[in-house]
Amino acid sequence: EIIEIDFILIGMDVVSLEKVAKIAVYVPPNTLPWDDAVQLALDYVEIPYDKVWDEEVLQGKLKDYDWLHLHHEDFTGQYGKFFAAYGSSPWYLMQKQTNENMASKLGYSKVSQLKLAVVRKLRDYVNGGGFMFTMCSGTTTPDIALASQYTDICDVMYDGDPADPNANDKLDYSECMVFQNFKILQNPYVYEYSDIDITDQELMTGQYNDYFTLFDFSAKIDPVPSMLTQCHTAAVKGYLGQESGFREEFIKPSMTILAKNNGTDWVRYIHGNLGRGTFTLYGGYDPEDYQ
């Protein structure tokens, strides 16, 4: 009886897993096996999954899956903002050509237009009951694409014409799923999409001081956040990515914050609901490699 009372007071609960989730990973066709930590993890533990990319998404094939994973994808049409450092590298040029070919094949004059169409399908997928888990640049760039759909944030090296210098005045945050009131960093030579990200601040903290705390939730009241924060430790070692985390002031109040760096406004883990579905954002690239 004492154990039963404690069980109730602590807020524990039992959740039945009624079916095996069918998983899709959004990944470009030229991605190497070691480029995506998620694929490595799924392969290692032998969890089956399918790969999908833009064509499959626009064909409506996401409805066949329960769980969609996005990793370090750029949905703004700026190819990861790698131009300054890698603009002449063969892998960058191949990535650019692959995306341009797909845009042309599917009837879009710009890659940014293709990616916006894909993001709308991702939003529809969640709204219809799917679960989407995103990491790294896959966290913020969908909302940046949605907010900037009525202007042009891509400079000439990305789509052949200049960006709108007043793009930040034309952002529509009502289109966004997670973020609001952010500003886009339009300099194509700066490896950063917007002021949402915390990477520059985090670098000043240093690897050995970077820990974030997973929040506690009652499994009886909040079963999904409770499942998402199950871990052997409440203090998790931080790590970087193109998008390492999110400044709290830019997160919509309807979101559930799952983890933060103590004493800061650095949010590392977010969960939200949309329609019949849910989505989760986790900052950083590879937990086993700080930088």
Give the location of each predicted region.
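Hydrophobic targeting/anchoring helices
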Residues: 1-36, 45, 283-284
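Catalytic beta-strand/loop cores that center a nucleophilic Ser/Cys/Thr
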Residues: 36, 43, 140, 159-160, ...
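Short, flexible, glycine/charge-rich loop motifs used to bind or transfer phosphoryl groups or to couple energy/partner
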Residues: 13-14, 57-59, 115, 245-248, ...
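Alpha-helical scaffolding within the catalytic cores
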Residues: 7-11, 55-57, 264-268
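Catalytic cores of eukaryotic secretory-pathway lumenal/extracellular enzymes that build
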Residues: 92, 107-108, 115, 147-150, ...
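Flexible, charged surface loops at secondary-structure boundaries
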Residues: 17-19, 60-65, 249-252, 273-274
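Helical hinge/lid and interdomain linker segments adjacent to catalytic or ligand-binding clefts
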Residues: 24, 28-139, 145
